[in-house]
Structures are given as C-alpha cells and as structure tokens.
Amino acid sequence: QNPNRFIGLM
C-alpha cells in the first residue's frame, strides 16, 4: 500500500 493513501484519509 502507498503511504500517499494514508494522506488521503487526512
């Protein structure tokens, strides 16, 4: 999974 996906939740 991409770390960018976590930023999307923010």
Curated annotation (Swiss-Prot):
GO terms for biological process: defense response; neuropeptide signaling pathway. The keyword Secreted applies. The modification Pyrrolidone carboxylic acid is found at Q1. It is found in: Secreted. Keywords: Amidation, Amphibian defense peptide, Neuropeptide, Pyrrolidone carboxylic acid, Secreted. The modification Methionine amide is found at M10. InterPro entries: Tachy_Neuro_lke_CS. Its main location: secreted. Transmembrane segments: none annotated. The keyword Lipoprotein does not apply. Expressed by the skin glands. One of its GO terms (cellular component) is extracellular region. Tachykinins are active peptides which excite neurons, evoke behavioral responses, are potent vasodilators and secretagogues, and contract (directly or indirectly) many smooth muscles. Belongs to the tachykinin family. This is Phyllomedusin. It comes from Phyllomedusa bicolor (Two-colored leaf frog).
